[in-house]
């Protein structure tokens, strides 16, 4: 997570390359990154949806969820947070923590989520790692502790990194990491960082505290275990750094994620109700009753593709699960692991892992799939209501039905926008998180469903109100030979209850024939629809 443009997608590219998932590091400018594969992302050069990118490191599978940084797509971040065990907050060495960094930290606080920091772009001009580190510590507290620090040479050229825990330095040679001696001018600083880490983990237990005050040095293994516990207990936020373009720091970050971030079975147990209304625990155990949570949906003219996380048990190919919300069975059919847009069919998705399935009929983002013997519904995803509205209209007539169908499909994958018809202004309205959000939706309508639309400011439905009673009169005279026509009526208008209408007749002696009365009533009602002034 982090602010837009801070380098999250580029970092994922580097990690995938270092882990051997890809044979080259994609670039956003070239439109060939693994996570920004949507045509809109390639065109706009930024992420608009959460992408899944798994890697394996030291026998540990890590599912990376690359989230958008622009606030218009905040709902994608919320969906990712719902299934993540921990968060990596990215901030740049150039500007330090931004508004997106603050929001990411606030999300972690709200979800009680373990977190680490990564300071990106440390090799770029005007980048200052230690200034950014100081800002992070000042803003988020002493729990922010550096694990990896950069090695600079000459005019602040980044040539490598030092791991303060194991006290080893490395530089990159091509795609390989090579160990080098720690520069003499950095040894004191590395010792200080390591001592600060020891002090932090000493607070985790009385035994560690006694050993710390006795002057006993912790081993590397004890320090790693202590940092992991501190991260899990939310009292420590380790800081890593690097540059995605050269891979400096990427090895250390993968090792840090595997060593310090909690695994799915360490996540707090979820509590929910079964079909009898009894509270039950959902434990991340492979032999438990199958329970999967759908956190993302991709929809087009061909159907849905649903991303899910296995919360308990395992999901097997062709098994049938129950959607308690929709009270419907769903056959899992073919199931896949996903890396960007690439899918690989597998027979089973294990507990704690992320997979995808196609052609679910009733299941939407935020739904739970479980066994028929234990129907459960986990807490869904809380999406902020839309706050920006525009009027949407087709460029050509006759495609209104295609627009409605397309928007309904798009809402399957993006529940953060809404549509409605305003009967007063006769406009179709679309509401989202901002102008970029709505512009992306319109582009998707064109690309996926072949419908071009325009957005305009909605008409303001001004309301008029009669302030006081008034009497008006009208006369009709027509003389063209023979019998002439003459009419003279008076009408009284007066204030009435808000939104209500009362039509009364005060005709005496049939002076105005009754067959004219309904036409007068109808005319008044039509005038009320549009108003007199507005």
Per-region residue spans from a language model:
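Structural and coupling elements of P-loop NTPases
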Residues: 1-534
């Amino acid at each position: 997570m982090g602010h837009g443009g801070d380098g999250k997608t580029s970092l994922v590219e580097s990690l995938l390359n270092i882990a051997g998932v890809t044979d080259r590091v994609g670039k956003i400018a070239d439109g060939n990154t693994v996570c920004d594969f949507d045509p809109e992302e390639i065109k706009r050069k930024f992420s608009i949806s959460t992408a899944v990118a798994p890697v394996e490191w030291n026998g540990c599978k890590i599912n990376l969820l690359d989230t958008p940084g622009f606030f218009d797509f905040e709902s994608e971040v919320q969906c990712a947070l719902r299934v993540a065990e921990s968060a990596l907050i990215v901030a740049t060495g150039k500007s330090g923590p931004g508004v997106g960094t603050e929001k990411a930290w606030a999300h972690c606080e709200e979800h009680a989520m373990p977190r680490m920091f990564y300071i990106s772009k440390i090799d770029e001009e005007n980048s200052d790692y230690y200034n950014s580190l100081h800002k992070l510590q000042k803003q988020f507290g002493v729990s922010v502790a550096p694990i990896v620090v950069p090695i600079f040479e000459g005019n602040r050229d980044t040539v490598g990194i030092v791991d303060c825990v194991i006290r080893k330095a490395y530089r990159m040679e091509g795609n390989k990491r090579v160990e080098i001696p720690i520069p003499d001018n950095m040894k004191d600083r590395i010792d200080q960082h390591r001592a600060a880490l020891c002090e932090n983990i000493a607070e985790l237990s009385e035994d560690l505290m006694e050993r710390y005050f006795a002057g006993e040095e912790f081993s590397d293994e004890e320090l790693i275990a202590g940092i992991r516990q501190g991260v899990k207990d939310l009292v420590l936020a380790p800081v890593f750094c690097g540059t995605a373009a050269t891979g400096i720091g990427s090895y250390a970050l993968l090792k840090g994620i595997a060593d310090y971030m909690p695994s799915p079975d360490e996540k707090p147990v979820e509590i929910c109700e079964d079909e009898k209304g009894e509270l039950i625990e959902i434990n991340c155990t492979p032999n438990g009753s199958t329970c999967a949570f759908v956190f993302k949906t991709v929809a087009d003219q061909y159907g849905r593709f649903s991303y899910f996380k296995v919360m308990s048990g395992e999901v097997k190919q062709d098994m049938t699960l129950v959607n308690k919300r929709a009270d419907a069975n769903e056959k899992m059919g073919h199931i896949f692991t996903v890396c960007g847009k690439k899918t690989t069919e597998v027979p089973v998705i294990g507990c704690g892992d992320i997979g995808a399935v196609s052609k679910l009929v009733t299941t939407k983002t935020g739904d739970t799939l479980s066994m028929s013997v234990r129907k459960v519904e986990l807490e869904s995803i809380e999406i902020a209501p839309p706050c920006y509205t525009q009027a949407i209209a087709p460029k050509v007539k006759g495609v209104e039905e295609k627009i409605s169908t397309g928007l309904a499909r798009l809402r399957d994958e993006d529940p953060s926008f809404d549509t409605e018809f305003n009967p007063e202004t006769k406009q179709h309205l679309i509401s989202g998180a901002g102008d970029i959000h709505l512009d992306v939706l319109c582009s998707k309508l064109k690309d996926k469903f072949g419908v071009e639309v325009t957005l305009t400011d909605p008409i303001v439905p001004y309301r008029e109100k009669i302030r006081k009673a008034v009497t008006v009169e009208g006369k009709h005279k027509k003389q063209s030979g023979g019998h002439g026509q003459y009419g003279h009526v008076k009408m009284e208008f007066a204030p009435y209850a808000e939104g209500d209408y009362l039509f009364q007749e005060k005709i005496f002696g049939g002076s105005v024939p009754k067959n004219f009365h309904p036409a007068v009533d109808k005319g008044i009602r039509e005038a009320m629809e549009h108003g007199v002034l507005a």
